[in-house]
Regions:
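Membrane-interfacial helix-loop segments of redox and metal-homeostasis proteins
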Residues: 1-213
């Protein structure tokens, strides 16, 4: 990652403005029960996309979690970077706390399952699970932070993080429409090819932009 540089205010405000506009669209065209569309917006009526907390709870928790994450610089990638390179444990302790909280919550609600079998919305092909996460991890390392950190920085006005966050939205839409997304029924039709291509692209970007010490 290159050093941060000052840019125009409009550049930094672009992603927060887009996020506010999307929120306003939701308020103007709220989801109609059991209907896949409300005005120009489309909603999931089944599957994981349809499972979410009530709007007020989601917004309130997002506000609280966002404050803590921004102030603590929470980042899963940064946690391991600081631990291995600088022996700095501040971010890693935050990651460990999140893992412990998720573990306890799942144990109390009966959602704790070990292994690949029986996991919600996931297939059991170990190799492509592993390669998919290697590709994702490499992309996050090149970007300088995990997806959550990118969202937090985008909200702070980091235009690079804003582009990354928009890329995640566009990428998710393309994956589901082009047959590369996987599910509990198995690997997507073109999931393997997309994983290999994505990994190759990340390697090329990394080597092309690498600098000698």
């Amino acid at each position: 990652m290159a050093a941060a540089t000052a840019r125009a205010v409009v550049s930094g405000a672009l992603f927060p403005v887009i996020a506010v506009c999307l929120l306003l669209l939701y308020l103007i065209f709220p989801q109609i029960p059991d209907q896949p569309q409300s005005g120009p917006l489309f909603y999931s009526v089944k599957g994981p996309g349809s499972q979410h907390a009530p709007f007020i709870a989601s917004l309130g928790l997002a506000f609280i979690i966002g404050i803590f994450a921004q102030r603590s610089r929470f980042c899963t990638m940064g946690a391991f970077r600081d631990l291995f390179l600088f022996r700095y444990t501040h971010l890693f302790l935050g990651l460990a706390a999140m893992f412990a909280a998720a573990f306890i919550a799942n144990a109390l609600t009966g959602g704790l399952k070990f292994g690949f079998e029986g996991q919600p919305v996931a297939h059991s092909d170990f190799l492509w699970n592993y390669l998919g996460m290697v590709t994702a991890g490499l992309a996050f390392a090149l970007a300088g932070g995990c997806p959550g950190r990118q969202l937090f920085m985008a909200g702070e006005g980091d235009s690079d993080a804003g582009i990354f966050a928009l890329g995640m939205l566009v990428g998710a839409a393309m994956a589901h429409n082009l047959g590369t997304a996987s599910s509990g029924t198995g690997i997507g039709v073109y999931g393997m090819q997309a994983t290999i291509l994505g990994f190759a692209v990340c390697l090329i970007i990394g080597f092309v932009h690498s600098k000698k010490a």
